[in-house]
Amino acid sequence: MPPCYPFLLSWEGWARDPPGRPGGAMRAHIITYGCQMNEYDSHLVASELVSLGWELVDSVEEADFVLVNTCAVRGKPVEKVRSLLGQLRKEKERRGLLIGMMGCLAQLDEGQQMAKKFGVDVLLGPGALTSLPEALKANERFFDLTFREDVLDYIPPPPKGALSAHVTIIRGCNHHCTYCIVPTTRGPEVSRHPDLILKEIELLKQAGVVEVTLLGQNVNSYGKDQPGFPSFAELLRMVGGMGIPRVRFLTSHPVNFTDDIIEAIAETPAICRYIHLPVQSGSDRVLRRMAREYRRAHYLERIRKIREALPDAVLSTDIIVGFPGETEEDFQETLSLYDEVGYDQAYMFIYSPRPGTPAYKHFQDLPREVKVERLMRLIEKQKEWSYRRNLEWVGKTVEVLVRGEAKEEGFVQGHDRGNHPVLVPASQAPVPGLYQVEIKQATPHLLFGEVVGAEAPAPIPLPVA
């Protein structure tokens, strides 16, 4: 049994009848911050709660137990959690609400102090999710921060009615970038058994899922920690041959994005030609301070290999602006790399100091106004390239997975195999599913199209870019 750290609860455990509903099921509500890994973990614990007889509800007001899945990668989601816990504590004092906290922030001293301050009853680190049944039987506050070996063994049931789903294949990270807290919060890399991965995907396929995304902090390292496991390239081929129409993966590391992975993508039609390859900076000096383990030339060589084998590949990246010590010259090197690659999409952030990381301990942060000004320039660069790339799709026919209503009136939204958001008239795609769509118009952020063979819709004014 993993160690736990007991404190007295404000009421007599979780086994009693819900307040005001004698004999009724206990009700839980889950709030998720952060990445797709957190979304997957929330689905995992949600299915676990249902199997234990709990009812999932859509709001804090309906719930007896609110579980907050936290993110610690940047400061903003941490502050959101702090604010939310303050609100939940008031509900706890008013009506005996139980509060749970999980995810990366829960693994850190900062999160544990927050949990004690705001009266959190259950605190589970990312490696202790399978302790939830034990926690729910407790009559004491339950904290578990261990990395349990069985956390990768659980296969959650397919999400009801979902056409796309995530599947975790590896947890943790063996890289130690100076800005990143993930190796601390999620531990070293541990690959999931391939039989469990394939079984989960088969269940998703039987449930009607047509798109699966393989998840990990560094999916490219899959299998390296377990003798006898397939490599990531081999796993891609296995999953790509299962009959799922669309297979994606997140996230990659340039050091581990090897030629055999590129070959597997090129030779397996089911694998989408969307590659997210975080560069973080175009400056070798900054990459060295980040401890990214590669340099600009290596990254560009990987891009060249990808373009050579996959000329239709859609490329996206992550970039951190204003890392400690970044000069204007360093930033110009990032802008020039952006031009050299010509990304379709990018996720850009100003550097956020995270306590417990080497960068936080050893480097002095830049003034916020410098970071924000550089970010604005990079965003303009990104919009310019995204628009240029999106225009290349006008007149082409693409496969779009329509998910549901768009914010724009009269349209439904989906995404193509290159992960572009695509809007089509709602009358042409009345139900979610896969459609062949001819792209008619592009903006920097969206593609607009019409379903091939569908009756021409009444004119709908397209949103202004």
From Swiss-Prot:
Cofactor: [4Fe-4S] cluster
Record text on cofactor binding: Binds 2 [4Fe-4S] clusters. One cluster is coordinated with 3 cysteines and an exchangeable S-adenosyl-L-methionine.
Chain positions recorded as [4Fe-4S] cluster 2 binding sites: 173, 177, 180
Main location, first listed in the record: cytoplasm
Record-listed [4Fe-4S] cluster 1 binding positions: 35, 71, 104
Catalytic activity, as annotated: N(6)-dimethylallyladenosine(37) in tRNA + (sulfur carrier)-SH + AH2 + 2 S-adenosyl-L-methionine = 2-methylsulfanyl-N(6)-dimethylallyladenosine(37) in tRNA + (sulfur carrier)-H + 5'-deoxyadenosine + L-methionine + A + S-adenosyl-L-homocysteine + 2 H(+)
Residue intervals of the MTTase N-terminal domain: 26-141
Subcellular localization(s) per the UniProt record: Cytoplasm
Protein keywords: 4Fe-4S, Cytoplasm, Iron, Iron-sulfur, Metal-binding, S-adenosyl-L-methionine, Transferase, tRNA processing
Domain TRAM: 391-453
Entry's EC annotation: 2.8.4.3
Top EC class, one word: transferase
Residue stretches making up the Radical SAM core domain: 159-388
InterPro entries found in the cross-reference section: Elp3/MiaA/NifB-like_rSAM (IPR006638), Methylthiotransferase (IPR005839), Methylthiotransferase_CS (IPR020612), Methylthiotransferase_N (IPR013848), Methylthiotransferase_N_sf (IPR038135), MiaB_methiolase (IPR006463), rSAM (IPR007197), rSAM_horseshoe (IPR023404)
Protein's UniProt keywords contain Membrane: no
Single GO MF annotation: N6-isopentenyladenosine methylthiotransferase activity
One GO cellular component, as annotated: cytosol
Superkingdom assignment: Bacteria
Free-text function comment from the UniProt entry: Catalyzes the methylthiolation of N6-(dimethylallyl)adenosine (i(6)A), leading to the formation of 2-methylthio-N6-(dimethylallyl)adenosine (ms(2)i(6)A) at position 37 in tRNAs that read codons beginning with uridine.
Subunit structure, interactors included: Monomer.
Family: Belongs to the methylthiotransferase family. MiaB subfamily.
UniProt-listed HAMAP family: tRNA_metthiotr_MiaB
Protein name stated in the entry: tRNA-2-methylthio-N(6)-dimethylallyladenosine synthase
